[in-house]
Amino acid sequence: MAVAAACRGPRIVRTHGDFHPFNILFDEQDELALLDASRGCKGAAADDLTALAINYVFFALPRRATWRTAFAPLWKAFWESYRLARGAEELERDLGMAPPFMAWRALVVANPAWYPDVTLETRDAMLTLAERALDADGLDLDEVEELFA
């Protein structure tokens, strides 16, 4: 399995642990601040990457037309920016480790205890994403498109 092989790699990073848009702030000078890093520790970059990236999918699902015009370009730009910053090899390694983290994040946002106003259709799509992630050897960035087909 790609996840097991990737875990043997040399790259362990400091993680935030709850990296999502509502924990990222910018001030008037565009300085970045991260909130709520209490669950941060050392781990896989794939954890924080999927925690942030899943929001492009999650916020597009209730208004599916926004995927093609807004969120898909942002999704692609996010991953491309990471590739440019870290290199293709690290991106591939992190995508190989991403499935369990993506599945976990999908389960979190599908959970009515944390997101009670999410529609059944959105919950179902997030659960589908979780199942597909767990069935995969790595995160296929293009597979997300199927949720909007």
Question: Can you describe what each PLM-predicted range is?
Answer:
Residues 1-16:
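An alpha-helical support segment within catalytic cores of ATP-dependent transferases
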Residues 38, 63, 85-97:
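Acidic, serine/threonine- and proline-rich low-complexity regulatory regions
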Residues 46-87, 102-119:
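Active-site activation/catalytic loop segments of kinase-like enzymes and analogous catalytic loops
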Residues 111-149:
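Regulatory N- and C-terminal appendages and interdomain linkers associated
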